[in-house]
Design a protein with these regions (language model features):
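Mg2+-dependent prenyl diphosphate-binding active-site environment of isoprenoid biosynthetic enzymes
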Residues: 19, 23-193
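N-terminal amphipathic/basic leader segments beginning at the initiator methionine
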Residues: 1-20
């Protein structure tokens, strides 16, 4: 199987797991939580987690809860980012806050964030590893927020240096990819090497 097919296959697995994870009923918040995340996406970040697990000899299925958690956090940040940027479209569809309003979208994002931790706690790994994974995951979310804060400041500046821009992107975009790769490798019993 070539890499493109493997990525597609893993993305399909993630999509099915996301549907299961988001199968709540009864409140409008649940529809808001599902709107963007089940509306499509490449699933690059969770696929990286799964591939990293396999690359060090781990089993694909072992990393699925973590991969789902990574995608939940990614989408939680997108919900909040769309509100801040006043974006009306994402992935060719109306943004969540346009459909459900800003207050409900904020709490939907918060709920996706909480659900990510519920997914991580499904992992069958040693407590010491879980502690390291949870610490890195929490630091990742904080650094994403720091990157978003920098992004907000940059909107009112016309003197943003390349170094500042790369630092912002490193916190917002690269950090979640780093966590996906590191977490997947850790779940697969990879070493620091």
């Amino acid at each position: 199987m070539d890499l493109k097919d493997e990525i597609g296959e893993k993305a399909t697995v993630i999509n099915e797991e996301l549907k299961k994870s988001l199968a709540f009923k009864g409140l409008k918040i649940y529809d808001a939580m599902r709107h963007l995340i089940l509306g499509g996406g490449k699933r690059l970040r969770p696929v990286i987690a799964m591939l990293s697990c396999e690359a060090v000899g781990g089993k694909n299925n072992d990393s699925i809860p973590f991969a789902v958690a990574v995608e939940l956090v990614h989408n939680f940040t997108l919900l909040h980012d769309d509100i801040m940027d006043k974006d009306e479209l994402r992935r060719g569809m109306k943004t969540t806050h346009v459909v459900f309003g800003e207050p409900r979208t904020i709490i939907a994002g918060d709920a996706l964030f909480a659900l990510a931790y519920e997914e991580i706690l499904k992992l069958k790994i040693k407590p010491e590893k879980l502690k390291i994974l949870l610490k890195d995951f929490s630091v990742m979310v904080r650094e994403i927020a720091e990157g978003q804060d920098m992004d907000i400041d940059f909107e009112s500046r016309n003197d943003v240096s390349e170094k500042e821009y790369l630092e912002m992107v490193g916190r917002k975009t690269a950090r979640i990819i780093k966590t996906a790769a590191m977490g997947g490798a850790m779940i697969g019993n990879g070493t620091a090497k």
